[in-house]
């Protein structure tokens, strides 16, 4: 395919067993996720976009929700490169207490394009928890309240749960 000949707004079809969405579809999906978040009792303090596929949706959600955005390099499928981020783990856990000694937990929305088999979400949970008091039971609260996950597409057969998504698939063997 000659990418130079593709005009803006062209909807791309399935290629090599992948589904490509148009820019308009991605914008609409991100607006839908922003509405889901606005209709919930939860609001992120910041958004984390997972490289590569989560960066565009994270930027759009950051703009729609007026919330800062950071990125996290987790490329399990594309060569296994991952970068830990102790600061994000500490923010979620509330490792740095306030002046009165109470934990100050930040709400973090982690955004990716797809929750396929759950490997990225599982890696983030394991990594962040291992960086900051890994055996503390408070992590159960952190994962159920402070950190939430959003993807454009959610595989219902995934081992991990996604809080916000737009499209659903059910594939036992992943993409």
Predicted regions and their residues:
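PRPP-dependent phosphoribosyltransferase catalytic core
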Residues: 4-13, 126-175
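A structural signal for isolated positions on well-ordered beta-strands in alpha/beta enzyme cores
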Residues: 46, 70, 109, 148-151
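Short, highly selective alpha-helical patches that border small-molecule cofactor pockets
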Residues: 30, 54-58, 62, 121
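Short glycine-rich phosphate-binding loop at a beta-alpha junction
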Residues: 42-51
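Active-site-facing substrate-recognition patch
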Residues: 1-43
């Amino acid at each position: 395919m000659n990418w130079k000949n593709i005009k803006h707004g062209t909807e791309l079809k399935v290629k090599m067993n992948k589904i490509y969405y148009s820019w308009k579809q991605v914008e609409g999906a991100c607006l839908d996720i922003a509405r889901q978040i606005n209709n919930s009792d939860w609001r992120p303090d910041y958004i984390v976009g997972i490289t590569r596929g989560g960066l565009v949706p994270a930027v759009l959600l950051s703009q729609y929700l007026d919330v800062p955005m950071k990125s996290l390099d987790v490329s399990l499928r594309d060569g296994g490169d991952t970068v830990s981020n102790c600061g994000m783990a500490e923010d979620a856990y509330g490792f740095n207490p306030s002046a009165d000694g109470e934990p100050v937990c930040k709400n973090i929305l982690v955004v990716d394009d797809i929750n396929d088999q759950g490997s990225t979400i599982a890696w983030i949970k394991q990594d962040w928890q291992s960086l900051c008091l890994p055996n503390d039971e408070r992590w159960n609260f952190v994962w159920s309240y402070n950190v939430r996950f959003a993807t454009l597409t959610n595989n219902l057969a995934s081992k991990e749960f996604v809080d916000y998504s737009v499209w659903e698939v059910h594939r036992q063997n992943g993409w």
